[in-house]
């Protein structure tokens, strides 16, 4: 009865247009008040405790790092470097946009931030060179999803907090899938470009390439600092996020000098707004997940699945279907916090590696970011290009097929996710 009330109230609130964070918190709070012996005071304590997780402290720092990198002109230098690397290939500007998304993803940890930073520059450049705007918009919208797959990733941090999994292992596990997806997108773009006879830029000289690499070097070093520092044990993922924020501010203010000190309060305010919004969603989602755990729903479902005799591949198929449906209607962090505690014990029972499950969930969240009606990347791409939302959706959907094929690869070839952590002795 309790769990039926919880989900019916959640779907009712979402159906009438209540924001997802409020829907999660209100349904969880009312369920506790009506069906739990806990007092109103304990509800406030629980809401605070759910957002007090040490791992989640990485989120505001990664958001701040991305804000400094975007405002400080790092994205423009990364795009110039990507163009210098692959711009001479047929369809090179589009391939360079994917490469730039991969590079910026390794700095920001956020998919919408990647789309905004790269798309605002790369799409306009493609249009000026004769590419169809819809073609460029579709590519950047999809390639921007790499922001949550290539480490550092805010969604991975949330999964780690929900399942008590190592953030460092998740970050390392995301490297190969992120590179593989980027490579697949580049190959498909090249094939399409050959068919459509899209233009290529003149090949740059070695001197020009070295100049672009030198300008982008300070941004590229951040990837080495984050992953190298975590793997070497120099600092934890949360400490790495803090180091990234300080480093990004230093580069933007004193190395590239694209920012003035007077602009810092604005950057801090914008990243603070994003942090508050995301943490509000996370706190309410964790309250909702607390109700699920209190009612022992994950344990009940795990027992039921075990009795059904589902094989691991069948279970993962069900996981993907549920996540793909949820991704159409909910924000990634909320989905992770609600469903990860349910899927996690079942996966452990079936012998599925928790890191592998985490990468599968992240790839599903990537797809959710580009599927209507609430795919955030679609709205960001529409705002960046000035295209109507419907046109943006039509531009992005053909490339969605690539992500679905990639999801199958990641789901049923665990080595894609686990080979690098195992090779580094992190298994």
Regions found by a protein language model. Give the residues of each.
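Alpha-helical transmembrane segments of multi-pass membrane transport proteins
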Residues: 1-427
């Amino acid at each position: 009865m309790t769990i039926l009330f919880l989900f019916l109230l959640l779907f009712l609130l979402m159906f009438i247009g209540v924001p997802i964070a409020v829907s999660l918190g209100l349904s969880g709070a009312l369920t506790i008040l009506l069906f739990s012996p806990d007092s109103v005071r304990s509800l406030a304590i629980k809401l605070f405790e759910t957002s007090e997780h040490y791992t989640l402290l990485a989120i505001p720092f990664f958001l701040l790092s991305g804000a400094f990198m975007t405002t400080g002109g790092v994205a423009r230098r990364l795009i110039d470097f990507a163009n210098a690397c692959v711009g001479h290939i047929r369809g090179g500007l589009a391939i360079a946009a994917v490469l730039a998304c991969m590079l910026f993803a390794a700095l920001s940890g956020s998919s919408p931030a990647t789309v905004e930073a790269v798309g605002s520059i790369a799409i306009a450049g493609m249009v000026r060179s004769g590419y169809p705007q819809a073609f460029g918009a579709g590519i950047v919208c999809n390639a921007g999803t790499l922001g949550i797959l290539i480490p550092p990733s805010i969604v991975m941090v949330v999964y780690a907090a929900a399942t008590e999994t190592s953030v460092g292992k998740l970050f390392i596990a995301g490297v190969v899938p992120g590179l593989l997806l980027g490579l697949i997108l580049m190959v498909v773009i090249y094939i399409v470009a050959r068919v459509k006879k899209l233009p290529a830029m003149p090949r740059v000289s070695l001197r020009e390439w070295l100049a672009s690499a030198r300008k982008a070097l300070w941004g590229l070093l951040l990837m080495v600092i984050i992953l190298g520092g975590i793997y070497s044990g120099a600092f934890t993922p949360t400490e790495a996020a803090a180091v990234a924020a300080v480093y990004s501010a230093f580069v933007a203010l004193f190395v590239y000098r694209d920012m003035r000190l007077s602009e810092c309060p604005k950057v801090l305010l914008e990243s603070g707004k994003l942090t508050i919004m995301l943490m509000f969603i996370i706190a309410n989602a964790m309250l909702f997940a607390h109700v699920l755990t209190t009612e022992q729903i994950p344990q009940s479902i795990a027992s039921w699945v075990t009795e059904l005799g589902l094989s691991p591949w069948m279970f993962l198929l069900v996981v993907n279907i549920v996540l793909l449906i949820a991704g159409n209607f909910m924000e990634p962090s909320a989905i992770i916090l609600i469903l990860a505690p349910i899927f996690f014990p079942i996966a452990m029972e079936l012998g599925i590696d928790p890191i592998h499950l985490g990468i599968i969930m992240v790839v599903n969240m990537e797809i959710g970011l580009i599927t209507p009606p609430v795919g955030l990347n679609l709205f960001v791409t529409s705002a960046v290009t000035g295209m109507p939302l419907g046109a943006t959706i039509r531009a992005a959907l053909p490339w969605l097929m690539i992500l679905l094929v990639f999801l199958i690869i990641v789901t049923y070839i665990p080595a894609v996710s686990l080979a690098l952590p195992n090779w580094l002795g992190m298994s």
